[in-house]
């Protein structure tokens, strides 16, 4: 299971160019040879590149400072200095890069082969061989290298999953994802146990499905209440939604309306996605009766009943998810 670092800030710097060289040709029988100082090398670029097997931003630390290498200085005999090595920052697909100070998105890396040069390294300085003229036969100066540049960036990962698991706090999402996948999401009997999105993988012999355990939605989440809309965007690109409803609670009938409303307010497209309504906690008193009432009220919706406690309905749910993914 991966715990998602949804957003972090880093500071990146491109390399400075190497200084040009002041040098003069020295050969036998030529006591006063002409200038032969080479140019400095280019500073390293800052490059962002998608790495397909990365799933999180956790390879980097919040506030980390990263820099490309500087170019090497020029040398005699008109030899140029070596270019500085580029700083390559590998990120998962669907990573957005923002300027911290302007809060503007600079670029987005979506596909496996995406690559962006965020900062170019400084140019190398010209060696003194470039400044020889009819009036300056022996130039004793060269250019310094151009300084590199620095940017404070915010990286944001838009979580991509096949299935988005949504529900009110304490509906049992973390327990469900732990049951049907190999993940072990933090489980506890209090609201907002899941503070960040988690991923789990449903495996079969022919297909894997990634399921996102998204923090609990509350009424008003689309306006930033509770854990807010920052987590709603994580399910914006999923193919299937699973609405998990605690049918042992007194307000189980209103839960469906709250979930649909909050998703619709945030993004009207979310409410039209393929979905399954899953009634949880069938092992508790009164839950079966409530489940039947929910099915009657939501005629036309796919409504399944489960109990994580005694594994009731789990296999049927998993099979239904695989079937729905192929439609």
UniProtKB/Swiss-Prot annotation:
EC number: 3.6.5.-
Domain Obg: 2-160
Compartment(s): Cytoplasm
Protein's GO biological process: ribosome biogenesis
UniProt: Mg(2+) binding residues: 174, 194
Superkingdom, taxonomy of origin: Bacteria
Alphabetic keyword roster: Cytoplasm, GTP-binding, Hydrolase, Magnesium, Metal-binding, Nucleotide-binding
Domain OBG-type G: 161-326
GO MF terms, alphabetically ordered: GTP binding; GTPase activity; magnesium ion binding
Family in the record: Belongs to the TRAFAC class OBG-HflX-like GTPase superfamily. OBG GTPase family.
Subunit and interaction comment: Monomer.
PANTHER family membership: DEVELOPMENTALLY REGULATED GTP-BINDING PROTEIN-RELATED (PTHR11702), MITOCHONDRIAL RIBOSOME-ASSOCIATED GTPASE 2 (PTHR11702:SF31)
Protein name: GTPase Obg
Organism of derivation: Borrelia turicatae (strain 91E135)
